[in-house]
Every structure is written in C-alpha cells, then in structure tokens.
C-alpha cells in the first residue's frame, strides 16, 4: 500500500491554525461563561481547591510516559513517507510504552489522591470530598492519555484541521455538562464527573476522525528494538512534560501550599485574561509546527529558519497587540466578570503578562527543538531553569511573604536563562547566530515596552461606569477593541519591516483562501 504525499504545507498550516483557533475560541467562550458560575457555585475555597487539583493531576501526566509526544513528532518527520507498516509500528510503540508506564500512573496517582487534601490544610469536612474528586481526575488523566494517541496521529500527519468544528462542539458540550452539574448542586464531585465525560467524548471523536481521514490508520506490534527506541525518546518527552508542568502549573501549587487556596482564586481570575495570550499563540504555532517538521525532515534548513522567523514574528504581533488591550482593560474586566475583590492589582497584572510572554517565546523554540528529535540538552536546560524558578518563587512567597508579586518575579528570574539558551540551540541548528536574533528582536522589543508602559499606566486610572450590566460590557468591549486596533496599527507599521508585513499579508491570504475552499 502506498500513501499520497502531502504537498501544500502552507495551506495545511493555515487550516491547522484555524482549527486550533476555533477550538480555543470555544474554550475561551465556555471558560468566560462557566467560570463565574463555578466561583459562585463552589465558593471561593472549593473553587481554589478545584484549580489546585487540576494542576496537581496535570503533574501526573509525567508518569504516563508521554509516548504520544514521541509519536506526534516521529510522524511529523515522516509525513512524506509512504511506509505504512513503519507508521503503524510507531503507533504500536506508543501504546506499548503507555502500558509500561500504567502501573506507575496508578501508584503515584494514588499517593497524590490521598495526601494532597491534607497538604492544602483543608477543614476535615472537605477532606473526603476532595479525595474522591482527585480520584475522578486521576481516571480522567488515564482516559486523556489514551485519547492523545489518535490526536497525535492527526497532528503528526499535519491533519489536525480535519477535526475542525467537531472538537469545539465537544468543548461547548462539556461546558454544558459543568453547568448542569452546578444546577443540580452536585458540587465538586459533579464538576469532576462532567470533566471526565468530556474527555471520554473527545477521545472517541478523535478516534473516529483518524479512521476516516488517515488511510494507514492501524496498529502493528512493534519489535523490542523499536519499543526501546521509542521508550528512550519518550523518556526525554516525559522529562520535558515535567518541565512544562513546572512552568505551567507550579504557580497555583506554590500559592496553594504556601499561602491559601483563596489567594489561588484571586490570582487565577486576574490571570485569566493575560493567559489568553498563551493559548492564542499556541493555537497558531502548534498549527504551523508539524509542517515545519516536514521541512526539517527534508533537510531544507534555510526554509525552516524562515518559518521559525514567521512564528516568532506572529507571536510578537499577537502578544503586543492583545497585551496592550489586556493591560488597559483587565481591572474592569475582572470587576464586571467576578467582582472587584478578585482583582490582584495593576503590578501583578503587568508581571503576569510578562510571564506569559516569556513562556510563549520559550515554548516556540522548545517546539522547534522537538522536531530535531535531539532532546537531552533542551530537557536538561529546561529542567534546571524550571526548578530554579520554582525554588526562587517558593522562597519569595514562603519566607518573605511576597505573595503574587514575589511568586511571579521568582518565576521570571528563574526561567530567564532559557530565554537565551533555547534561541542559541535553535540558532546553531538552523544557522542563525544569536547576534542576528538579538538585532532582529531589538526594535519589536522596544516598541512592546513602550506600548505596555503606556497602557499599564492608563489602566490604573481608567474606570468605566460603576454598573455591571450589559451596557458596561459594551463599553469595555469598545475600549478593548479601540486599544487593540491602535496597538495593531502601530505594531504593524512601526514594528515590522516591509518584508515582514508582506509575509503576514501572504499568510493571512493563504488562510482565507484555504478556509473559503473548505466552505
């Protein structure tokens, strides 16, 4: 059996980015509507517990072996290959590694389920409920690790766009299940069960999409040598997952263990709007990256360097434009959304935004390094930076009582080394010296700093009418749109060269054409 060879990487990248954007748009809308209901339905304490449980169980994904990541990037490099058996054996290897790690997941998960509630210093009446909810989330984790197999096949084959609209619909349905659980007053347990059902539906969806759209889909028993090779590769992806968990989930755990779950609630609600940046950029970048894998696999490093430049340029444009609007409007957004008492302040908002931007840039280069399948240096550097960040943040919060500001400063300082190490690693592989990277980033960085300083200052004293009705939301939306529009105009005309502006216009044109053809 021979497979058709994929040709138009730009079109697929555009469609993948669009599909990811639709998914994120659904998650954004669902989160925006459901979060206030969760805060009111669970209360400030249990909502904080729910957030910490979610972050803690995310750490357990490390124990699953992360074989699906190895599968995704292996297929990304082989997407032009017509060897069916080799691809099916890759799937078999991923499942074999998953089975090897299953006992570890159960063992470590059981320990977390039992001891986490007491570590949060919860009242005795909440201990049992929290343990049961944690157990449900452990089952969700196991189900999700299996659901990642068909998802990784789609993304590795650069066919993520084939689920366009379907996964967004499942996200909306999952939000509906959460609202139903709150309406029925099932509390923390009902919300946990709703999230489990959503994961099960998502897994079945991706499996059906793979069967329809991937001609070679199937599993072949791998050889012992292939399994060992996959296990070796998965080991580094596993460690990298741990690094990412330290970057993505350590903030809530530090505040939850060293401060209080109530402060976790305030921090997470203040962070909600800035965190949009990470997800939007991830939606764009993750849609482009598998296509970049095909370019790297073909040996065209010059073109790969050009695509990497586009990724960084688009990331900068997005976080500068939206970040300006967020700094100006976040205080009013939190006030209208969940109440002014849940706003952490202007300085924490600015620092959180900078933390999100730092994470975006680190993840961009980390994803490119993944495509080389040469992971040890990346993982070890990331582990050192992430652990250092957690230690510094924990000291500032636990010993000095610096709260949210101290925690974010600690994370920024600890991860700063990765902001230099990863670009150097990528530059060596693609032939882009660090000096030229710094030179290219200087003008955009200065422009972003100026816009952020201006909008953060204005955001301190700008206040809309004190009402919280629909009219207030419209005024806030107008203010945000006007800010984003002005920041976009300045960023596009001042921050980009003529060649970069042409490149973005070409990318947007390709996206529009791809979408119109799909319709």
Task: Go through each PLM region and give its residues.
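Helix-loop junctions and terminal segments of transmembrane helices
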Residues: 65-81, 155-156, 214-216, 275-316, ...
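Membrane-proximal transmembrane or re-entrant/amphipathic helices at the cytosolic face
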Residues: 1-7, 424-438, 453-519
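N-terminal membrane topogenesis motif
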Residues: 1-31, 85-96, 127-130, 206-210, ...
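Interhelical loop/hinge segments that connect adjacent transmembrane helices in multipass membrane
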Residues: 1-13, 206-249, 253, 287, ...
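Membrane-interface helix-loop junctions in multi-pass transport and translocation proteins
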Residues: 37-46, 161, 172-204, 376, ...
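Hydrophobic transmembrane helix module of multi-pass membrane transport proteins
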Residues: 9, 13, 96-249, 457
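Membrane-interface junctions at transmembrane-helix termini in multi-pass inner-membrane proteins
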Residues: 14, 141-166, 189, 353-387, ...
């Amino acid at each position: 059996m021979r497979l058709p060879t994929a040709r138009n990487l730009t079109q697929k990248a555009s469609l993948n980015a669009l599909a990811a954007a639709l998914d994120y748009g659904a998650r954004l809308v669902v989160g925006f509507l459901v979060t206030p209901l969760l805060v009111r339905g669970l209360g400030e304490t249990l909502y904080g517990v729910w957030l910490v449980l979610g972050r803690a169980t995310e750490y357990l994904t490390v124990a699953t072996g992360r074989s699906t990541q190895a599968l995704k990037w292996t297929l990304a490099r082989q997407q032009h290959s017509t060897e069916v058996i080799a691809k099916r054996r890759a799937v078999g290897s991923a499942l074999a590694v998953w089975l090897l790690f299953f006992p570890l997941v159960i063992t470590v998960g059981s320990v977390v389920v039992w001891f986490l509630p007491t570590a949060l210093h919860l009242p005795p009446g909440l201990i049992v409920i929290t343990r049961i909810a944690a157990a449900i989330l452990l089952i969700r984790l196991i189900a999700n690790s299996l659901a990642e197999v068909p998802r990784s096949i789609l993304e590795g084959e650069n066919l993520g766009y084939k689920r366009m609209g379907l996964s967004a619909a499942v996200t909306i349905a999952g939000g509906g299940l959460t609202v139903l659980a709150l309406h029925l007053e099932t509390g923390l347990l009902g919300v946990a069960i709703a999230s489990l059902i959503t994961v099960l539906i998502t897994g079945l969806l991706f499996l059906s999409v793979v069967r329809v759209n991937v001609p070679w889909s199937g599993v072949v028993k791998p050889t012992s040598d292939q399994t060992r090779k996959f296990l070796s590769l998965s080991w580094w992806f596993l460690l990298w997952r741990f690094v990412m968990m330290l970057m993505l989930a350590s903030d809530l755990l530090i505040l939850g263990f060293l401060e209080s779950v109530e402060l976790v609630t305030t921090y997470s609600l203040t962070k909600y709007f800035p965190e949009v940046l990470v997800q939007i950029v991830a939606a764009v970048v993750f849609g482009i990256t598998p296509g970049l894998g095909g370019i790297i696999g073909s040996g065209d490093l010059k073109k790969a360097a050009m695509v990497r430049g586009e990724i960084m340029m688009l990331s900068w444009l997005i976080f500068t434009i939206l970040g300006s609007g967020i700094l100006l409007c976040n205080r009013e957004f939190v006030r209208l959304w969940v109440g002014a008492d849940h706003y952490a302040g202007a300085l924490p908002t600015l620092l959180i935004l900078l933390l999100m931007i730092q994470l975006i840039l680190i993840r961009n280069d980390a994803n490119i390094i993944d495509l080389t399948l040469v992971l040890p240096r990346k993982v070890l550097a990331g582990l050192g930076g992430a652990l250092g960040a957690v230690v510094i943040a924990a000291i500032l919060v636990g010993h000095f009582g610096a709260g949210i500001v101290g925690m974010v400063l600690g994370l920024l300082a600890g991860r700063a080394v990765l902001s230099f190490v990863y670009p150097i690693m990528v530059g060596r592989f693609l032939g882009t010296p660090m000096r030229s990277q710094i030179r290219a980033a200087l003008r955009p960085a200065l422009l972003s700093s100026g816009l952020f300083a201006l909008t953060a200052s204005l955001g301190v004293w700008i206040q809309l009418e004190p009402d919280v009705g629909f009219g207030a939301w419209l005024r806030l939306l107008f203010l945000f749109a006007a800010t984003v529009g002005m920041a976009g105009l300045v960023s596009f005309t001042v921050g980009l060269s003529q060649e970069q502006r042409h490149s973005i216009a070409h990318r947007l044109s390709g996206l529009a054409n791809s979408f119109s053809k799909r319709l």
